[in-house]
C-alpha cells in the first residue's frame, strides 16, 4: 500500500508540502503542486480522506442549501458556487429546503452533521431570529439573497425593491399606464420587495393600482398562466405585465399566445432574474438582471477567505439590479 512517505520521496519534497497539496493550500507553487500530483498518480496513491479530515479538522466539503434543486435560477447559483470551490480543491454537498421552515432547519442540521466546513444557504421560510441563532454554531454560514442586519458580513443580497421599481418604471417609460403585476409568493422576502417596487413606481407616476390587476402566484410558469387568466377574466384594461421572475413571464407569454394575443403588440411583458432561457423566448424577454452567478461566486470566495484562509479580492455584499433590454415591450409613446 502506497504511503505519503513514498509520494514525498518520489516528488523530492517534504511531507508537509505533500500535505499542503492534498489540502488545497495556496502556499504551494504550481510547479511543486504538479510534481506532487504526478508522483501521486504514478504511485496510485489515494489520500485517506477520513484520516485527513481528522488530522486537519477540515472535511474540504462545503454544504449548499437551496429552495429547489431544479430550475434555471438555482441551477445557475449552484453551478457558480461549485465551480469556484472545485477550482480550489473543495467539494460540495447539496440539499433542498423547499421553502418550508422545518425542511430548511433540517437541511442546515444535516449539513452541519456531515461536518461541512461551511454552509452557503438560500433560505426563505426560517425567520431572522433563527438565522441569528445560527451564529453560535461552529460551522460558518453564508446567506445568499437574504439580509439580516446583525449578520451583514455574512449576507450577500440584491436590492429587489429597486429591481421591481426599475421593471415597472421601464414599462411606464414606454408609455404604458394600465399595468398588471404577477408577483411571487408574498411569504418570500424577495417577492415582497419586488411588489413594493412595482407599487412605488406606479405611485410616483400617479398611476392607479388596481387590486384586480395584482396576482400572487408561484415563482413558476403556472403562476404566470393563472395570473394572466385572472386578469383577462377581470375585464380590466391592461397593456403590460410586470412579472415577479422570468418563469412567471414565460408562463404568461405562453398563455397569451394560446389565447390569440400578439406579443408585444397586444401585451408587453417584463421579467426578473435574466435566467438562461430569457433570451430564447419569443419575443426575447426584457428583464431585470439578478447577478446570481456573481453572487454564487462571491459566496464561495467568502468561504475560501474566511474558512480556508485563502486570499481573495474585495468582497461585494450588496448588488444592484440592472435592466436587460430586449424585445418584449411595445412602445406606446
Summary of predicted features, one role per range:
Residues 46-110, 114-118, 196-199:
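Amphipathic helical "hinge" segments at domain boundaries
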Residues 156-181, 196-200, 221-229, 249, ...:
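Hydrophobic alpha-helical segments within soluble ligand-binding/sensing domains
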Residues 1-59, 333:
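N-terminal helix-turn-helix DNA-binding module of bacterial transcription factors
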Residues 99, 121-166, 174, 187, ...:
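Flexible loop/hinge segments that line or gate small-molecule binding clefts
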Amino acid at each position: 500500500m502506497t504511503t505519503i512517505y513514498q509520494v514525498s520521496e518520489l516528488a523530492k519534497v517534504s511531507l508537509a508540502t505533500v500535505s499542503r497539496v492534498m489540502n488545497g493550500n495556496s502556499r504551494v507553487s504550481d510547479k511543486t503542486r504538479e510534481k506532487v500530483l504526478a508522483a501521486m498518480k504514478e504511485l496510485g496513491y489515494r489520500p485517506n480522506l477520513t484520516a485527513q479530515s481528522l488530522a486537519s479538522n477540515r472535511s474540504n466539503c462545503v454544504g449548499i442549501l437551496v429552495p429547489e434543486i431544479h430550475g434555471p435560477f438555482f441551477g445557475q447559483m449552484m453551478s457558480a458556487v461549485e465551480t469556484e470551490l472545485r477550482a480550489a480543491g473543495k467539494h460540495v454537498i447539496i440539499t433542498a429546503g423547499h421553502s418550508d421552515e422545518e425542511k430548511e432547519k433540517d437541511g442546515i442540521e444535516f449539513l452541519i452533521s456531515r461536518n461541512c466546513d461551511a454552509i452557503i444557504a438560500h433560505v426563505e421560510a426560517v425567520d431572522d431570529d433563527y438565522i441569528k441563532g445560527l451564529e453560535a454554531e461552529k460551522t460558518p454560514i453564508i446567506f445568499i439573497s437574504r439580509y439580516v442586519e446583525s449578520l451583514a458580513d455574512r449576507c450577500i443580497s440584491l436590492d429587489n425593491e429597486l429591481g421591481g421599481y426599475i421593471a415597472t418604471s421601464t414599462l411606464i417609460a414606454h408609455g404604458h399606464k394600465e399595468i398588471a403585476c404577477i408577483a411571487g409568493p408574498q411569504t418570500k422576502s424577495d417577492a415582497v420587495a419586488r411588489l413594493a417596487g412595482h407599487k412605488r413606481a406606479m405611485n410616483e407616476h400617479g398611476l392607479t393600482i388596481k387590486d384586480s390587476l395584482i396576482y400572487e402566484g408561484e415563482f413558476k410558469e403556472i403562476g404566470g398562466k393563472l395570473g394572466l387568466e385572472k386578469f383577462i377574466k377581470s375585464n380590466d384594461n391592461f397593456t403590460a405585465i410586470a412579472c415577479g421572475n422570468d418563469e412567471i413571464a414565460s408562463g404568461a407569454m405562453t398563455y397569451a399566445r394560446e389565447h390569440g394575443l400578439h406579443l408585444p403588440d397586444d401585451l408587453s411583458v417584463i421579467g426578473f432574474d435574466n435566467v438562461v432561457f430569457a433570451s430564447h423566448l419569443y419575443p426575447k424577454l426584457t428583464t431585470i438582471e439578478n447577478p446570481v452567478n456573481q453572487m454564487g461566486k462571491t459566496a464561495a470566495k467568502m468561504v475560501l477567505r474566511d474558512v480556508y484562509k485563502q486570499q481573495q479580492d474585495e468582497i461585494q455584499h450588496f448588488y444592484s439590479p440592472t435592466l436587460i433590454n430586449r424585445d418584449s415591450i411595445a412602445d406606446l409613446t
